[in-house]
């Protein structure tokens, strides 16, 4: 079994490193040749995971031809806004790989497409060869082999089962799902709500406010999931609620951090600079989610206020207080129907 993880950021590095436990041939591919050389020299990703030594068996390269030769599974750990360009550029090398696993969490701004849709379009492959791995998972804790549970989803449940067996580790339990739409929607939109939670913390609004934002944010995520035909229970699982809780409450969360810094008075640009080159997908997904809500007339007040703070310079305090002045509503959407059977 030969697996290549494309993208040498924190999550790509962590996942590639721990997969060496299985005895497979694992390659980590990075775009920047100079950075890859430094990582190889030190056996440490000083750019995104400083302080963690890499498994001696992990191969690291910037050579795309070597990284794709005789590979069984390609895992993409690439920011969603750059995924399509990466696939276009390297399509000729990726053509012979059997399975493609996305780990990115976002929605493409220009097309409002999910990552699995982008992979299918650009590589011209059937959905049964495409999967998404998602759920509550910080790279540092994965490197430390602390217990976690995540989910792998594919439209073909046999594909999900096959990849589940291959990728599960002694400390990493992977569940399977055939609701790739729900898994990708949950993974993307929770980042926007995490920014809102961070803004609330930055403003010093306390635990009550954050709990309300997380809970009502989950409702907004579910509205979009249902719009696209996902199963509501998926959003209550690891890729939805699980990841939402993690990302909205931890100092390790980039999206929460961006929100907190903005709540404390920094501009978006200043907050992003504090991440030192790391990506907070929620900043971009806020645009995608806002466009989806506008085009489909989906009520998403938290998402819309986050968008206004990030892109229309609305005061963070005014944005969160405006949520309290919305029309009083029933807690459960009046047109919500769900048949358990």
Swiss-Prot record:
This is Glycerol-3-phosphate dehydrogenase [NAD(P)+]. GO terms for molecular function: glycerol-3-phosphate dehydrogenase [NAD(P)+] activity; NAD binding. Pfam families: NAD_Gly3P_dh_C, NAD_Gly3P_dh_N. The gene is gpsA. PROSITE patterns: NAD_G3PDH. The lineage of its organism: Bacteria, Pseudomonadati, Dictyoglomota, Dictyoglomia, Dictyoglomales. Keywords: Cytoplasm, Lipid biosynthesis, Lipid metabolism, NAD, NADP, Nucleotide-binding, Oxidoreductase, Phospholipid biosynthesis, Phospholipid metabolism. It catalyses: sn-glycerol 3-phosphate + NAD(+) = dihydroxyacetone phosphate + NADH + H(+); sn-glycerol 3-phosphate + NADP(+) = dihydroxyacetone phosphate + NADPH + H(+). Belongs to the NAD-dependent glycerol-3-phosphate dehydrogenase family. NADPH binds at residues 10-11, 31, 47, 105, 139, 254, 279, 281. It comes from the Bacteria. One of its GO terms (biological process) is glycerophospholipid metabolic process. InterPro entries: 6-PGluconate_DH-like_C_sf (IPR008927), 6PGD_dom2 (IPR013328), G3P_DH_NAD-dep (IPR006168), G3P_DH_NAD-dep_C (IPR006109), G3P_DH_NAD-dep_N (IPR011128), NAD(P)-bd_dom_sf (IPR036291). Sn-glycerol 3-phosphate binds at residues 105, 135, 137, 190, 243, 253-255.
